[in-house]
Amino acid sequence: MQKATYYDSSAIYGGYPYQAANGFAYNASQQPYAPSAALGTDGVEYHRPACSLQSPASAGGHPKTHELSEACLRTLSGPPSQPPGLGEPPLPPPPPQAAPPAPQPPQPPPQPPAPTPAAPPPPSSVSPPQSANSNPTPASTAKSPLLNSPTVGKQIFPWMKESRQNTKQKTSGSSSGESCAGDKSPPGQASSKRARTAYTSAQLVELEKEFHFNRYLCRPRRVEMANLLNLTERQIKIWFQNRRMKYKKDQKGKGMLTSSGGQSPSRSPVPPGAGGYLNSMHSLVNSVPYEPQSPPPFSKPPQGAYGLPPASYPAPLPSCAPPPPPQKRYTAAGSGAGGTPDYDPHAHGLQGNGSYGTPHLQGSPVFVGGSYVEPMSNSGPLFGLTHLPHTTSAAMDYGGTGPLGSGHHHGPGPGEPHPTYTDLTAHHPSQGRIQEAPKLTHL
């Protein structure tokens, strides 16, 4: 590098006013490769200015630049011992001689061995070349960018170091930040305000899908999703936090809506006054439907008696006529007494307001297809039929829709002789009362 700098310094030194009298004027009139043809002692003297021309030519990339540069370096080592001779007039005459024999570059190499011994003394003994060495450093920065790059790099290095520290701070905040360039783009504002992250639709779909399965993300899964979606772990963590808050807010809004608008239907069955036939049906275990299409043996009288359309079932009972005095609907023989205790459905199934109360819904008779079906949840202990299962399918049939064609209907428990009910069809006046009763009790 010292030789190169010395060589470049001579090249730049050729343009200074010190050599303007001979070197600069001489360089203007000469071709780049002409000086190598001169072989005499005069040629040694004017080789130095010729090298000054060749230094820019070497930058141009000519094919023989390496050989020429070596020749120039070796010839340059000799001439500095004769700096005063540079200003003598014998230098201008050689140009006409040097112009014709330009195509002889390989001849200079044999000549250099003679001046080479003189190479070591010149730098120490000659002041002008030293000044040339000292001067060209600022000019070399302008002409040779390869040499000035380290110095320029040193000047910029503090700023570069600072920016690297900034990027380190940012990357420490978010471990992998390639895709988040939007967050880090303002270096000065990164600490004060974080830019809003814009997620793509594909990223949002994946995040929503993951949130559907897991509201809280474990770290391995978060790292996996960060690599999958080109996001940082911090971004995914913050997105899940925001999404959980949004979900909580939505649930609160839904809870408010259901509490305000949805409690009226949930409270409707609670008060006993609003319990109609439909509510009593819902309270049953199997919710027996009303089937008028399956006619019992004496279907016509009950159809005339129960001629109300199905639309009138949900209506509350107070709209009906007041109940008649207690009627003997059926008599059950006591276990030990011969007396026939009366069973009053009005006193049992109705409260003061004429509708079924909630405690008696399970025990109230239900009309199915022209027959009474008595659920056995509460009526079993009343009639002494404690051995029957408490289901609607095992309910007692008072209307005669079963396989028994005769008027007498025995209780379904064959092992118990007590609950033998008298024929309802044999007593015609009581049958008329039975036909009227369902209007008042079973609506």
From Swiss-Prot:
Cellular localisation: Nucleus
Compositional bias per record (Polar residues), positions renumbered to this chain: 132-151, 166-178, 188-197, 257-267
SMART domains given in the database record: HOX
Matching CDD domains: homeodomain (cd00086)
Motif Antp-type hexapeptide per record, residues: 156-161
Function, in words: Sequence-specific transcription factor which is part of a developmental regulatory system that provides cells with specific positional identities on the anterior-posterior axis. Binds 5' to its own homeobox.
Similarity-based family: Belongs to the Antp homeobox family.
Protein name, entry field: Homeobox protein Hox-A3
The species this protein was found in: Mus musculus
Species lineage: Eukaryota, Metazoa, Chordata, Craniata, Vertebrata
